[in-house]
């Protein structure tokens, strides 16, 4: 009986030891935080991993870089990933937080197919952010002055995702898992655009991925991106600058609500878009007016309303007639509210969208004007 008990104890001890069968020696791994993917002139993939370097107190004091860029090439994504180990430690992707796709790659190739390996890979998290580079993606991962202590570019891109509550020109972060769902379900969508400006990574508008081809068809400016965030009801903050009789005025967004109601008229959809925004008059350089005056505030509200309506019309016209695609998910409103009509048009929705009419009801409410009236 005692012998049986001893064997039982030994058996369970062996099971516990087996729990470390897949252990990885961290000194033999590269911890990637960002990955830039570009298409080369010979149509191969160029991968640029941005890897963390271990930092001691001495290395921080001496100003040694905290990251290193590791580049590899391959005819397929996986070949390029595996070729990293030829010259550097294998990449450990558990900490990979942002994937940046180059402009040439996205214009020429199906984005969903490019991401196929990363969606299948159980080591990489689907919550990693997806962004579009204006130009080469690898350029965004470089810094201007190599002798200066600067933030890791990929870390900066990650940190900036939290700023959408302060600046409406920053999109709600798009994750690779969500992008794959959009592509698989036949949606066009927007993707945060970034660029290298004088050696620093900077958010700069949005790229448009078109349904069907899943390719990049163009970019929107930062201002146009903010306008579409208003239309989609995703705007969380930011400002709208304009002028009153030549004097600068600025409205700070505190709360905004969007309602979209499609109706079918003569066999065509008409979208009624209502946007109601509350905020603060944070800047008023008109020396001849008084913010304590209700009539003056109403006039300014009307100025902001007309500006937003003008901006919305311009960017929607661009989507309809230049890019001919719906990256703001208006199709969902048709699908949900008019399912029979949707079944007839879903196969050629982009063509229907290009001929769609819009009616706008935009209102601004100034709820505060700061600590001074003039």
Curated annotation (Swiss-Prot):
Chief location: membrane
Compartments reported by the entry: Cell membrane
Lipidation (N-palmitoyl cysteine): 20
Tagged with keyword DNA-binding: no
Pfam families attached to this UniProt entry: Spore_GerAC, Spore_GerAC_N
Lipidation (S-diacylglycerol cysteine): 20
Signal peptide feature range: 1-19
Keyword tags: Cell membrane, Germination, Lipoprotein, Membrane, Palmitate, Signal
GO BP, sorted A to Z: spore germination
One GO cellular component, as annotated: plasma membrane
Family note: Belongs to the GerABKC lipoprotein family.
Function statement: Involved in the response to the germinative mixture of L-asparagine, glucose, fructose and potassium ions (AGFK). Cannot stimulate germination in the absence of gerD and gerK gene products (fructose and glucose receptors respectively).
Alphabetized PANTHER family for the sequence: SPORE GERMINATION PROTEIN B3
Name listed for the protein in its UniProt record: Spore germination protein B3
Organism of origin: Bacillus subtilis (strain 168)
Gene: gerBC
């Amino acid at each position: 009986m005692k012998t049986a008990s001893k064997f039982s104890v030994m058996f369970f001890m062996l099971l516990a030891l087996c729990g470390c069968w897949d252990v990885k020696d961290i000194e033999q791994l590269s911890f990637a935080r960002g990955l830039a993917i570009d298409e080369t002139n010979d149509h191969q993939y160029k991968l640029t991993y941005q890897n963390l370097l271990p930092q001691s107190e001495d290395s921080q004091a001496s100003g040694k870089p905290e990251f290193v860029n590791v580049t590899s090439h391959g005819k397929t994504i996986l070949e390029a990933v595996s070729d990293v180990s030829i010259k550097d430690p294998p990449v450990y992707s558990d900490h990979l937080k942002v994937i940046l796709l180059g402009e040439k790659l996205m214009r020429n190739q199906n984005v969903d197919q490019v991401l196929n390996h990363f969606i299948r890979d159980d080591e990489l998290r689907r919550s990693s952010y997806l962004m579009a580079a204006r130009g080469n993606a690898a350029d965004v991962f470089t810094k201007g002055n190599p002798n200066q202590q600067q933030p890791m570019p990929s870390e900066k891109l990650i940190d900036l995702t939290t700023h959408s509550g302060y600046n409406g020109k920053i999109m709600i972060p798009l994750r690779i898992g969500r992008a794959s769902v959009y592509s698989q379900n036949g949606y066009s969508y927007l993707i945060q655009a970034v660029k290298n400006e004088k050696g620093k990574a900077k958010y700069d508008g949005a790229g448009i991925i078109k349904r069907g081809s899943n390719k990049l068809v163009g970019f929107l400016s930062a201002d146009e991106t903010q306008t579409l965030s208003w239309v989609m009801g995703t705007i969380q903050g930011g400002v709208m600058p304009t002028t009153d009789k030549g004097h600068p005025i600025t409205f700070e967004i505190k709360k905004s609500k969007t309602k979209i109601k499609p109706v079918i008229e003569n066999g065509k959809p008409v979208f009624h878009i209502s946007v109601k925004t509350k905020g603060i008059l944070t800047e008023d350089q008109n020396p001849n007016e008084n913010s304590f005056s209700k009539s003056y505030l109403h006039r300014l509200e009307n100025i902001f309303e007309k500006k937003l309506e003008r901006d919305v019309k311009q960017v929607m016209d661009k989507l309809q007639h230049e890019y001919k695609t719906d990256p703001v998910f208006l199709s969902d409103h048709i699908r949900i509210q008019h399912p029979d009509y949707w079944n007839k048009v879903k196969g050629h929705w982009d063509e229907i969208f290009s001929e769609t009419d819009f009616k706008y009801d935009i209102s601004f409410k100034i709820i505060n004007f700061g600590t001074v009236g003039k």
